């Protein structure tokens, strides 16, 4: 089963299954000298962690264990391996789906490709979103490296079901949405999202949503024409996330409804710099970053595992039957999906920053360490749960 690695210079390989002993990631290409603590990784994982209100009831501690590539609190330049144990597994809840593939899931395609006898049906196996733990763990290191360029990345849930945010939002509000149980950047929006999630839970159903990720202060010129354009790599990164159905940046699909005179980014002079007046392009033109904030969105479909009865096939008889999925599932996978989308954007940006020479590939100097630590501590402490806007 190839296809488990992502990135060029900053390269990750994830491993593990939903109900296996552990999941994890190997990170290649991290320069030596970067200060890394277990707490740095735990901070990012905490916003993806299950077992909280409005998400799956599976209670995983998600405590990372760094087993290689770090010595005396600093990276050595060798591959970094991070393990996260699966501690709250109830495989008996999945016995029915062994013979009844779930609608909307990868069950049947996996069976057809790899064979029924080779398919790990427990919790979705390798196709489970549990795999994304490794991506989020790696993003802590990516985000810390990006402190060198003072590049910050944050995401929020722009829409859930039919409720959508259609008013301006600041980067600080987006950053503080980490502490919202439904990743809302406004208090009024949080209440509406919570009502929808409660409704879906009662009905045994689910909702989809749209995650929006902002890259603040990205370096200019990230991206490599022609097939490694920044937008292309961002699209691949986000579309690789389980349940993601679509990707757009800047104006996105709305640009198709506009005239060129409306959609074009006018170039203006601000001080001694050339800037774009509206940033309609979402910080990317010609596949290269412009220096404006990068704005991307990805659409998550509703969680496929629902209690409502649906048609499927009983593989023992070959006949149609029904299935009601019993287990611990997110009523809206987009809520925790924001953290994963944020992580994937971080991995793309740090990889291209290294390729463009903005971040060293061999060793971090002592002066650079001071800059990284100062900015990272600011990132950790900047927002508090009470700062989610009204």
UniProtKB/Swiss-Prot annotation:
Positions that bind NADP(+): 48
Function field: This reaction introduces a second double bond into the aromatic ring system.
Similarity comment text for this entry: Belongs to the chorismate synthase family.
Entry binding sites for FMN: 126-128, 286, 301-305, 328
Enzyme class: lyase
Listed EC numbers: 4.2.3.5
Protein name, per record: Chorismate synthase
Swiss-Prot/TrEMBL GO biological process terms: amino acid biosynthetic process; aromatic amino acid family biosynthetic process; chorismate biosynthetic process
Keywords: Amino-acid biosynthesis, Aromatic amino acid biosynthesis, FAD, Flavoprotein, FMN, Lyase, NADP
Catalyzed reaction equations: 5-O-(1-carboxyvinyl)-3-phosphoshikimate = chorismate + phosphate
Origin organism lineage: Archaea, Thermoproteota, Thermoprotei, Sulfolobales, Sulfolobaceae
An example molecular function term from Gene Ontology annotations: FMN binding
């Amino acid at each position: 089963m190839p296809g488990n690695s992502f990135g060029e210079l900053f390269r990750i390989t994830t491993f593990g299954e939903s109900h296996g002993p552990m999941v994890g990631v190997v990170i290649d290409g991290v320069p030596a000298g970067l200060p890394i603590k277990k707490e740095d990784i735990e901070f990012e994982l905490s916003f993806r962690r299950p077992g909280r209100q409005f998400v799956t009831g599976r209670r995983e501690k998600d405590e990372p264990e760094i087993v290689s590539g770090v010595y005396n609190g600093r990276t050595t330049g060798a591959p970094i391996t991070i393990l996260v144990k699966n501690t709250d597994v109830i495989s008996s809840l999945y016995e029915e789906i062994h013979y009844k593939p779930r609608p909307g899931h990868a069950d049947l395609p996996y069976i057809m490709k790899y064979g029924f006898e080779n398919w790990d049906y427990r919790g979705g196996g390798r196709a489970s979103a549990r795999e994304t733990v490794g991506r989020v763990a790696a993003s802590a290191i990516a985000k810390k490296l990006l402190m060198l360029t003072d590049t910050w990345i944050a995401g929020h849930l722009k829409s859930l079901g039919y409720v959508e945010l259609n008013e301006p939002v600041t980067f600080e509000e987006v950053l503080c949405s980490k502490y919202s149980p439904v990743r809302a950047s406004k208090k009024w929006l949080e209440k509406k999202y919570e009502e929808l999630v409660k409704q879906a839970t009662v009905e045994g159903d689910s909702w989809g949503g749209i995650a929006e990720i902002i890259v603040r202060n990205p370096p200019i010129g990230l991206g490599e024409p022609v097939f490694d354009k920044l937008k292309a790599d961002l699209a691949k990164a986000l579309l690789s996330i389980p349940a993601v159905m679509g990707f757009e940046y800047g104006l996105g699909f709305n640009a198709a409804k506009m005239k060129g005179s409306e959609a074009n980014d006018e170039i203006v002079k601000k001080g001694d710099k050339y800037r774009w007046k509206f940033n309609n392009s979402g910080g990317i033109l010609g596949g290269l970053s412009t220096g404006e904030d990068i704005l991307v969105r990805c659409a998550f479909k509703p969680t496929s595992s629902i209690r409502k009865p649906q048609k499927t096939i009983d593989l023992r008889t070959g006949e149609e039957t029904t299935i009601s999925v019993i287990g611990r599932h997110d009523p809206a996978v987009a809520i925790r999906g924001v953290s994963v989308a944020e992580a994937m954007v971080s991995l793309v940006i740090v990889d291209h920053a290294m390729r463009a020479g903005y971040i060293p590939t061999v060793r971090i100097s002592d002066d650079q360490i001071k800059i990284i630590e100062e900015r990272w501590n600011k990132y950790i402490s900047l927002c508090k749960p009470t700062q989610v806007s009204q």
